[in-house]
Amino acid sequence: NYPLFSALGGYVFGQNDDGTYNADDVGIDSEGGLAAAQKFADWSNEGLISKDVSYDVMIDSFSSGKAPFAITGPWAVGSFTDAGVNFVVEPIPPVEGGTPEVFVGVQGFMQSAFSENPDLATTFMVDYLNTEEVQLALYEAGNRPPAMTSAYDQVSSDPLILGFGAAGQQGTPQPAIPAMSSVWDSWKDAYSLIFTGSDPVTAFTDAAAQIRSKIAEG
């Protein structure tokens, strides 16, 4: 829901001057956030969205040709190709005049401090995982663009890579701060309340209060 929420004026956390996220600035109940909540309620009342359409239902509906589009990421490509769906990847179009942002993330490898063979683990990560062969294999397995430039250059013409790249241009880094873990459950519950007829402003206001409380508790 974040792309639609952001297009309607909402945000999760504000940002400091240096671009880092400010956990003290929760935007779920900001003016834009509450306006977004009301719009979600309107869409629910019009039958455009439903709490019964889970992520899995969305994927199945698109894979079977019952839905014209799916808002998802590279991890879903395999399901669509396996189903024989003829599809393209494009940025989400404007919503109510606003540009949807997507959360952009990266994946990497970390070595455990409790590794029984730290030297071997380091060698595996640096000398094996950090090769074009492995980077390209990870791309083929998960449709994620490689971070290694020499590997990326070999797949940069892939229409899927181009599509996700274009979508990422209007994206924002997913907050990688501890406070983000306090957001998901309360925010998800607020959407469920809206989709079952609760007052949208109250739902998001209460969710924001819960999030602030969780952050304060640490």
Model-derived features: where do they sit?
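Extracytoplasmic/periplasmic solute-binding protein
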Residues: 1-24, 67
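Glycine-centered hinge/linker elements that transmit conformational signals in sensory
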Residues: 5, 19-52
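Extracytoplasmic/periplasmic substrate-recognition and gating elements
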Residues: 38, 81-143, 193, 198
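Short helix-initiation/N-cap motifs at beta->coil->alpha
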Residues: 50-63
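Beta->alpha turn/N-cap motifs
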Residues: 55, 71-77
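Short, well-structured alpha-helical segments that form the helix of a local strand-helix-strand
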Residues: 62, 200-212
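Paired acidic/hydrophobic, glycine-rich loop segments that form the ligand-binding mouth/hinge
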Residues: 68-73, 88
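Long, aromatic- and glycine/proline-rich binding clefts that accommodate carbohydrate-like moieties
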Residues: 90, 138-186, 192-193
